[in-house]
Amino acid sequence: MDSVPRDYSKRVYQGVRVKHTVKDLLAEKRSRQTSNTRLNGSVSSSQPPFIQMPGSPVMSGYYGVRRSFLSDSDFHSSKQFSNDLYTSGMSKPFACESTAGQSHTGLLESYLAEPYGDYRPPALTPTPSSLFSTSTLPPLLPPPFPSDPTHFVFRDSWEQTVPDGLSQPDPMPADALQSLPPSTSCLSQLESGSSTQHRNMGWGASLAGAQSYSLHALEDLHHTPGYPTSPPYPFTSFMTVSNDLPPKVGPLSPEEGSDVSSLHDPSPWTKEDGSMAWGSYECRRAY
């Protein structure tokens, strides 16, 4: 009982505002009355929750007033209820979590086992003929080793035409070159060569062999003795050759004639680095 007057004197001494000090005094009286009437010998245990903190006398006094209305029996009963709630709640969620975790894992395993365990392995384990016979997959080359049928080489859509272009070049320029009479102009042949170059330059650097073959054929045609130095340019040669460049019908100017005469020199075709590009650009400039 000695601690109560000390707290009382402290609160009176620390109180700055009269309203809060009166409320604190009333709260102390009520708390002492309730503690004396309902509890015997537990005053020291019931008093610490209502001790005012010295740092903030006003607010702690206000909260002390609010807390002093709760009786100790209610406080202990709520404490006990909270303990029961925590113990029962903690024991039940653990059990629920264990059962829920098992049920969730079981459900997930059942759901995952159906699409991934039952349906996908049959799709991956049939024979290669039934698996790769779908139209969405690219066609397969024959296995490189006849004794080992498991080596399959995939072939992309853009790779299908590259070996064909290497093994079998475009027959149209060769037929046109063979079918042309000896009186046709060199410009038409160069033009057909430029068209083949324009077609072959799209394949990339892997087709340098095919381009070099067409160039060698043009060089051989240049050195044939049956070509006139300044022949007339008939319009039938432009119609018979299938080329990508549009034909220009009309007389040639002297500048264009000089450019065309420079085409007879095989020096641009023997360049090592830019022979493809120089030949195609000179043919276009001649046009």
Curated annotation (Swiss-Prot):
Expressed in tuft cells of the small intestine, trachea, thymus, and colon. Residues 10-32 form the OCA domain. It is found in: Cytoplasm, Cytosol; Nucleus. Keywords: Activator, Cytoplasm, Nucleus, Transcription, Transcription regulation. One of its GO terms (molecular function) is transcription coactivator activity. InterPro entries: OCA, POU2AF2. GO terms for cellular component: cytosol; nucleus. It holds the Pfam family POU2AF2. Residues 24-51, 161-199, 247-279 are annotated as: Disordered. Residues 33-49, 180-199 have a biased composition (Polar residues). Signal peptide: none annotated. Disruption phenotype: Mutant mice generated by CRISPR-Cas9-mediated gene editing are born at normal Mendelian ratios, and have indistinguishable weight, morphology, fertility, and organ histology from normal mice. However, tuft cells in the trachea, small intestine, urethra, gall bladder, tongue, and nasal epithelium are indetectable in Pou2af2-/- mice, whereas a partial loss of tuft cells is observed in the colon. The keyword Transcription applies. PANTHER family: POU DOMAIN CLASS 2-ASSOCIATING FACTOR 2, RGD1562914. Transcriptional coactivator of POU2F3. This complex drives the development of tuft cells, a rare chemosensory cells that coordinate immune and neural functions within mucosal epithelial tissues. In the N-terminus possesses a conserved OCA domain for bivalent binding to class II POU domain-containing transcription factors and to an octamer DNA motif (5'-ATGAAAT-3'). Belongs to the POU2AF family. Interacts with POU2F3 (via the POU domain) in a DNA-dependent manner; this interaction recruits POU2AF2 to chromatin and increases POU2F3 transactivation activity. This is POU domain class 2-associating factor 2. The gene is Pou2af2.
